[in-house]
Amino acid sequence: MKVAVLGAGAWGTALAGHLAARHDTLLWARDAALIAGLQARHENSRYLDGIALPDALRYDADLGAALAHGAADDALCVIAAPVAGLRTLCHAMRDAGCVPAHVVWVCKGFEADTHLLPHQVIAAELPEQQSNGVLSGPSFAREVGQSLPVALTVASVSAECRERTLAAFHHGAMRIYTGDDVVGVEVGGAVKNVLAIATGISDGLGLGLNARAALITRGLAEMSRLGVVLGGRAETFTGLTGLGDLILTATGDLSRNRTVGLQLAAGRTLNDILGALGHVAEGVRCAQAVLALARAQSIDMPITQAVCGVLFDGIAPRDAVSGLLRRDARAE
């Protein structure tokens, strides 16, 4: 199978390395200097340093060439750009005049200005693209790059897209499950990043494991409430792309969103934290979108509201926690 991966950040690079072990894989980035470094060293020293990439993996800064590779009869196109750049990439794909027949995206979050999920952005910008889906689940790029075991879910209403994605990714240490709840999978992948900031704050303040468990459990309830109202199925949120991804992102030290929370608890400013990270922390980007959607639907999401207060309203982390503890008692 031919596979084109669009986006050479940490996640796109790790997935391309996995795919290249079995398939004819081309990794694209618009940054010619990044591509030149990949070609010279077979390592993404900018985003995934220390991980050797397969010799068979090829690289290109020409979007047209990458799209042509991913548009072959027996091919798959993987969109690994962050949500913030998804619409721009779709524009470029359309302008290139070559939209692959089978597309799967791996980005997580809501578009900041429109509050749209990735599938809604793609439907608006590439309406002719019908065989598509989302690949998501509890996963750190570095561990995938190290070929450590991982389980992901592809969700699509297209059986052909599910089967093609399964054929591409299900090998080696990667196990793929299939489903059709695109909305549920996307909401889980977005909201868990916001909740991971909350658990990072709690852990950074030294509030203990009991508090962490409470935040994860009540955070899952927030995720499910929003997801069901937006069209997802309740059972999706207890699976890999909901609870599974939440547990990993909230507790794993490779989590950028958890790191943001830890650093906020230590008294650092958000600008300093993001500057030091040098990578995307999607929870920061989509927290306001999640809260706006919740308010528009009259959904109670107190943990998300507390995170937004710390990130954007100058509320001290310890005061945000105190506010949660002062909430009225209620039935679970």
From Swiss-Prot:
EC number(s) on file: 1.1.1.94
Chain positions recorded as NADPH binding sites: 11, 30, 108, 141, 256, 280, 282
Main location: cytoplasm
Involved pathway(s): Membrane lipid metabolism; glycerophospholipid metabolism
GO cellular component: cytosol
Active site: 192 (proton acceptor)
Alphabetized SUPFAM superfamilies for the sequence: 6-phosphogluconate dehydrogenase C-terminal domain-like, NAD(P)-binding Rossmann-fold domains
Molecular function GO terms recorded: glycerol-3-phosphate dehydrogenase [NAD(P)+] activity; NAD binding
Any one GO biological process: glycerophospholipid metabolic process
Pfam families: NAD_Gly3P_dh_C, NAD_Gly3P_dh_N
Keywords: Cytoplasm, Lipid biosynthesis, Lipid metabolism, NAD, NADP, Nucleotide-binding, Oxidoreductase, Phospholipid biosynthesis, Phospholipid metabolism
Principal EC category: oxidoreductase
Subcellular location: Cytoplasm
General function of this protein: Catalyzes the reduction of the glycolytic intermediate dihydroxyacetone phosphate (DHAP) to sn-glycerol 3-phosphate (G3P), the key precursor for phospholipid synthesis.
Family: Belongs to the NAD-dependent glycerol-3-phosphate dehydrogenase family.
NCBIfam families registered for this protein in UniProt: PRK00094.1-2, PRK00094.1-4
Protein name in the entry: Glycerol-3-phosphate dehydrogenase [NAD(P)+]
Organism listed in the record: Burkholderia orbicola (strain AU 1054)
Phylogenetic classification of the source organism: Bacteria, Pseudomonadati, Pseudomonadota, Betaproteobacteria, Burkholderiales
Gene behind the chain: gpsA
